[in-house]
């Protein structure tokens, strides 16, 4: 997918759930106790570290779900770089509303900016090649949509959103079905022409069998060393899209991209990204 934003209504259910979790049954009782309802402020959402911004759309929605009268101005758009001390967003209106939405807005923005920033580092390592960086389904339960959106903001690409998006034959499928040929023949018998088929291999002889049998659009080269990946690219000779996966850490990306694979997929983009330090100041 190539989108870098979504309609607000698509994102709202995830944000509403987070607000309900945070506000609880009785709402923000601290703010109600100490802040007069007519108190107004302008708050600034600041970056405290350098990175690539994500989650500004979601932060805006969070503030507006709590109070539609808040005036929210996004100063740095999703996908843009940020520097320490830079103001990313201003929020003007009832102080109580701003405080009640603060933590949810910051949690989303910090988490997603961390993912976008790590993705951008991976993408930078592919410079000078045609290799693309893609994420996986190793996402936080319930947050896959927004975490994959953050990958796009960092310059990466998305893999499947769900098991229903494409056929991806993994090692356990191959073992249960009786081998590469058996699983590909079974897939060819039922797969629609609209459905992409990807198969995982971890040995070159399996790749050779995939090429001989046919029926796959993409081959996932799992846990192969760099030299084996280079041989796999030569064997495929452009007949299939090749995706390298398994142990794809940042320090290895440049050498893997240089082998000529089409994609490098890494679960680390979403499961290992560190939240970027953002703050909200009055």
Model-derived features with residue positions:
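Acidic/glycine-rich phosphate/pyrophosphate-binding loops and surrounding catalytic core
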Residues: 2-213, 218, 227-235, 241-243, ...
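Cys/His-rich Zn2+-binding cysteine-cluster or related metal-binding knuckle/ribbon modules and their
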Residues: 250
């Amino acid at each position: 997918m190539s989108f870098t934003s979504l309609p607000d209504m698509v994102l709202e259910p995830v944000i509403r759930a987070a607000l309900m979790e945070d506000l609880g049954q009785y709402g923000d009782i601290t703010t109600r106790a100490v802040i007069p309802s007519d108190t107004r402020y302008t708050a600034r959402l600041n970056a405290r570290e350098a990175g690539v911004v994500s989650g500004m759309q979601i932060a805006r929605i969070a503030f507006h779900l709590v109070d539609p009268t808040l005036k929210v101005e996004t100063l740095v758009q999703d996908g843009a770089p940020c520097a320490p001390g830079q103001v990313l967003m201003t929020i003007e209106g009832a102080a109580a509303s701003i405080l009640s939405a603060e933590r949810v807005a910051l949690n989303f923005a910090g988490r997603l900016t961390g993912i976008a920033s790590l993705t951008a580092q991976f993408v930078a390592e592919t410079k000078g090649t045609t290799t693309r960086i893609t994420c996986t389904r190793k996402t936080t339960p319930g947050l896959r949509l927004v975490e994959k959106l953050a990958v796009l903001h960092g310059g990466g690409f998305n893999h499947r959103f769900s098991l229903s998006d494409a056929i991806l034959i993994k090692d356990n499928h191959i073992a249960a079905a009786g081998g590469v040929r058996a699983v590909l023949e079974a897939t060819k018998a039922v797969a629609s022409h609209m459905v992409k088929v990807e198969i995982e291999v971890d040995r070159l002889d399996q790749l050779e069998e995939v090429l001989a049998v046919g029926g796959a659009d993409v081959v996932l080269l799992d846990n192969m060393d760099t030299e084996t990946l280079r041989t796999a690219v030569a064997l495929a000779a452009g007949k299939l899209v090749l995706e390298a996966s398994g142990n794809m850490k940042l320090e290895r990306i440049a050498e893997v991209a240089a082998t000529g694979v089409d994609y490098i997929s890494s679960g680390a983009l979403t499961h290992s990204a560190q939240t970027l330090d953002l703050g909200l100041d009055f």
